[in-house]
Amino acid sequence: MQELKDRILAEGEVIGTHILKVDTFLNHQIDPAFILRMGKELADRFAGAGITRVLTVEASGIAVASAVALSLNVPVVFAKKKQASTQSDVYTSQIYSFTRQESVNITVSKKFLPADDVVLIVDDFLAHGEALKGLVDIVRQSGAGLAGAGIVIEKLFQRGGAALRAEGMRIETLAAIERMEPGKIVFA
């Protein structure tokens, strides 16, 4: 998506060679009209896949996942990183956050992910693939079908997407980055 690439180049901040800050429009401050356009683009790429639910993980994936779900006219559910005391009947998966340097358990209430669903996973970033693997695990636990994943920004050099594609998973990415360093971003 050219508009996204242009925004990344104009507003993104590369920290080291592995971290891309896009907090002016995606991860802290949100540009709602732009989020809706990205959501429509991802929804269009999965049109006809029979999707009945969109799944993401809190927090930065929620805005785009909601935009995708709105375009598909289906509900969105997000995995929580802290299980509420009121939740007992949940699917759980452990993921490792390289950004935060910690493992967390993500949970989804079983009542929001029935076995007859066809799920599209949506997230803001795909790097090592830990969050995506955890969400795939939750979908598998539920017995639901998995249509694939829609990703806003994929860092190809961190190989998470390649590993999941090798397992047969369909992943659609709006902006794929081959490499980056301060002052330079190279798209695929």
UniProtKB/Swiss-Prot annotation:
Instruction: List the catalytic activities from the record.
Output: XMP + diphosphate = xanthine + 5-phospho-alpha-D-ribose 1-diphosphate
Where along this sequence does the record place binding of 5-phospho-alpha-D-ribose 1-diphosphate?
Answer: 127-131
Pfam families on file: Pribosyltran (PF00156)
Q: Matching InterPro entries, A to Z?
A: PRibTrfase_dom (IPR000836), PRTase-like (IPR029057), Pur/Pyrimidine_PRTase (IPR050118), Xanthine_PRibTrfase (IPR010079)
GO MF, any single term: xanthine phosphoribosyltransferase activity
HAMAP family xrefs: XPRTase
Specify the protein name: Xanthine phosphoribosyltransferase
